[in-house]
Amino acid sequence: MNGTEGPYFYIPMVNTTGIVRSPYEYPQYYLVNPAAYAALGAYMFFLILLGFPINFLTLYVTLEHKKLRTPLNYILLNLAVADLFMVFGGFTTTMYTSMHGYFVLGRLGCNLEGFFATLGGEIGLWSLVVLAIERWVVVCKPISNFRFGENHAIMGLAFTWIMACACAVPPLVGWSRYIPEGMQCSCGVDYYTRAEGFNNESFVVYMFTCHFCIPLTIIGFCYGRLLCAVKEAAAAQQESETTQRAEREVTRMVILMVVGFLVCWLPYASVAWYIFSNQGSQFGPLFMTIPAFFAKSSSVYNPMIYICMNKQFRHCMITTLCCGKNPFEEEEGASTTASKTEASSVSSSSVSPA
């Protein structure tokens, strides 16, 4: 084995010289240069500075403007709540521990950090799945006369929390466990060991199947069908310039959504699966650290993709920030009108993300 396994930790370094120490008790500067820990703390601080305001603003603007309190926006708010879970439960903890060079908060802190980071990420992921299903049902109309209402939104919210808890809770109760990973300043699911009594192997297979592959398949199917529906509508109205603009807008939205999902999770999932399927192989602490924290940065660009591209929300946000007046009123109003005209040629509901 090319690492050192101890009680509730695994460090990717063989303890041949006796310098390896518990990540709960001693700085881990023998893994990487102390400057790397400072850089990690600075990056977490940067994510907090961006992630908290944009997600809090999303919640505040939606509550302030009644016209934004639509059933679909319940899901978008859920996405913002998930991102705030990651900011408060994950980023602040990691920033604090990286300043010390080890997981100074102990086992309890590791469990809490791992739980909240996993819960926030999973709520966000399953919220995207619900959004994809809603767009597919409303635009492609596989169910005739379906209208997405408040009850559907509430069921969608409950579904995201149930699925998120189904992934985040088991490591707290003995099915797998949370341990420090990478540079030992943040905690995640144990992909690294076959620790007796924790059934890590079965949990990792379950997590990858039910909480990565299935969501990715659903999102790909729904947005693929949505794109086909837009193309078919555009082909039936070749002379309509507004329809062509609608096709380009939705195509761009779909590409951003799918790419955003893959950029968030594919590197982390790929590295985690590699470590799991090649346990005992040699890898450095940065091998898991970089994709893990790049995935967490989704709390910043999630709201940009799924909410800030909504013209109505953007108008309300600018109005709130500018104390009740939108200096770009004419431009925003024209854009919103054009968007509604474009959308009507494809679906009576909408083809934009909200």
Curated annotation (Swiss-Prot):
- Per the record, a Pfam family? 7tm_1
- Specify whether Glycoprotein is a keyword of the entry: yes
Main location per the UniProt record: membrane
In its record, the post-translational modification comment is: Phosphorylated on some or all of the serine and threonine residues present in the C-terminal region. Contains one covalently linked retinal chromophore.
Motif segment ('Ionic lock' involved in activated form stabilization):
134-136
Report how it sits in the membrane: Multi-pass membrane protein
> Extracellular topology: which positions?
1-36, 97-110, 174-202, 275-286
Side of membrane Cytoplasmic, spans: 62-73, 134-152, 225-252, 309-354
Q: Name one GO cellular component term.
A: photoreceptor disc membrane
* Protein name in UniProt: Rhodopsin
- Organism, scientific name: Salaria pavo (Peacock blenny)
Q: Which gene encodes it?
A: rho
